[in-house]
Amino acid sequence: MKKIFTLLFLMVTPASAEKLSLDAVSSYFNTMTTAEAAFIQSNDDGSQSTGRMYIKRPGRIRFEYDPPNLALVMVGGGQVAVFDPKANAEPIRFPLRQTPLSLVLERTVDLARRDMVMAHTNDGPRTIITLQDPDRAEYGYIQLVFTDDPMQLRQWIVDDNSGNKTQIALSDWTQDQKMPSILFNIQAEMQKRAN
């Protein structure tokens, strides 16, 4: 009787979703031209911030934070710029290649070909892929969390390899909207803030 119950239980329990293939995830990024989403950023210290994220592939992303934060993070021209409205100084700038985010902002993403996938698992309806640039392991890794049906990036976690983790949860996606390039122009933003 116990075996029959177990068999019936297995028959009515839905099978776990299969993980998305690396080729499917690569195609997801490669076919994305522009995207916009709401985000919630969670930091190691327990603090949270919200805002809007804008992506224009390849190589550009913008995070506009909601009040009271009002920070702005821009990626364009191979650079990352962090604008802090509390400081009347130039933005903090560093090369995009020094962040794991560069792996998904490349012109052509090919996860199956490059030796950057550290882990590729699924957790029910979610596929989790952990990426690290093998040539720049000192800059940490990024963990991407996707749902399928429809396939969508829902979250990422960046570990900077010095013990700091930042989690970004995404919702309210829109894709392939017109987006002016000025949104990602760091020099133009600096000039605007100087006036």
List the predicted regions and their residue ranges.
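Envelope-exposed proteins and targeting segments
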Residues: T33-A35, S49, R57-G59, N69, ...
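Gly/Pro-enriched, hydrophobic low-complexity segments
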Residues: R113-R114, M118, N122-N195
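A short, Trp-centered hydrophobic/proline-enriched beta-strand micro-motif
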Residues: S27-G46
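An acidic-aromatic
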Residues: Q48, R52-L103, T166
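Short, solvent-exposed helix-to-loop capping segments enriched in aromatics
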Residues: F29, T99-L111
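Boundary at the C-terminal end of the N-terminal hydrophobic targeting segment
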Residues: A15-K19
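Sec-dependent N-terminal signal peptides
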Residues: I4-T13
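Short hydrophobic/aromatic-rich beta-strand segments that constitute the beta-sheet cores
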Residues: F39, I61-Y65, V80-F83, I129, ...
